[in-house]
Amino acid sequence: MRASPPAHSLLWLLVLLFAAPWASAQPAEPNAPPPPRNLIVLIPDGFGPTSQTMAREYLHEIEGRELVLDRILSGAVRTYASDSRVTDSAASATAYASGVKTYNGAIGLDATRAPVATILEAAEARGMATGLVATSRITHATPAAFAAHVPQRGMELDIAAQMLDQGIEVILGGGRPFFLPTDTNTDYAGRRDDGRDLVEEARERGYAVALDRAGFNAFSAIPLGGADTAPPVLGLFSDSHLAYEIDRDPSKEPSLAEMASFALAHLSTDPNGFFLMIEGSRIDHAGHGNDPVGHLHDIIAFDEAVAGALAFAEQDGETLIVVMADHETGGLSLGRNLDGRGIYDWRPDVLAQATRSVEGMLALVDEGMAPDTLMATRGGIVDLTDDERSALRDAVGVIRGPGSLYSVMAAILSERALIGWTTGGHTAVAVNLHSYGPHAERFAGVMQNDAIGRTLADVMGFDLDALTAELRAELRQEPETVVE
């Protein structure tokens, strides 16, 4: 059963206006294969080519298995934004979702701040089921770019409202407070000061809602049988981002692979096909923090979600999978020679000893554990040098910067593993492209990120230009919704 947004919803009007039969899509080239029935886009945020090498070699050497992503590696993506050679997630995800380059920070707008339709909106207009799954707040930049239109990515309260109005069938991630009012009577804090309770509004529209792990487990009882019988679902499992995979408490939060598997089972019952975006969000966050442990294990968790999607597509035969990061984060290198020691190597075995991310270890420091003890028991570094112990002691109480406890812990782990980082931000490095299924050959070689978006629309037969024109016309007719 599809959600029923209010009549005043601009984006719901788009669905009504542009709902059309399959035959109304853009005409195919003579003898071209039919469009895929289903489309799965997977985005490992902040995942560069070196990240893929790190995970590949770690899995091969430490766990004796291969990286699933390597099976479908097909090319590379240039990621620059309209206003910078180094993109952010908002601009790059907008390029993937809408086929246009835009400025850093933009969500669903072009470089002139005019709204542009997305492939999710096109899928909804066709009557397909749609889903968004992320380990970040679901209102964060990447998922937002597929379902909202705002001038700055930080407008997460607006993004949450627009996302709900889209009628998306599966929404799973973190970010509860952006859906709840500040005066909420629930056990969870809210950040909405407009009085709206989007969780309650979702229930009124027919959504099954989960705000914790128990609620997610209850989703398994939902009857599956197509859009007319299966209710849409909204799952918000954290106040902010979900935990890094290596820190995750399975009794409190589902994994990315679990959420992706549920989304596939739920959406695949729709007779009109589905669109699903899955983001491994926290790969990027660990890159920003130069945390090799968090980075590595979230890549592996993402690869498990890819494995599930690939198994589905292999059996289904009508599903296109496209995988690419929005950008690289951290300037990661495998091999480190900043101290003149001349060691040409890197050590995945060091990372294998760690059982917590740096963020996870800091949480235990807040509970009273000593940093040097944590580095031994959770970081796996049992032979700290005097210099390392001194750096840890000096960093206690330092919140930010190179001398913070986070930075010192991350640096010790990286140095021991002979891993280097060049930045705490993003880089301009081209990211790897992966594809499988019908029309996968069109996602190969070196492509621009906006070309990815246009090609996705083309192979699916979506007319984004027509939807964009209608979106802008509707905005002109409803001044209160104009993007400023």
Task: Identify the residue ranges that each predicted region occupies.
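A post-motif C-terminal structural segment
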Residues: P36-L39, F47-Q52, E57-T94, Y103, ...
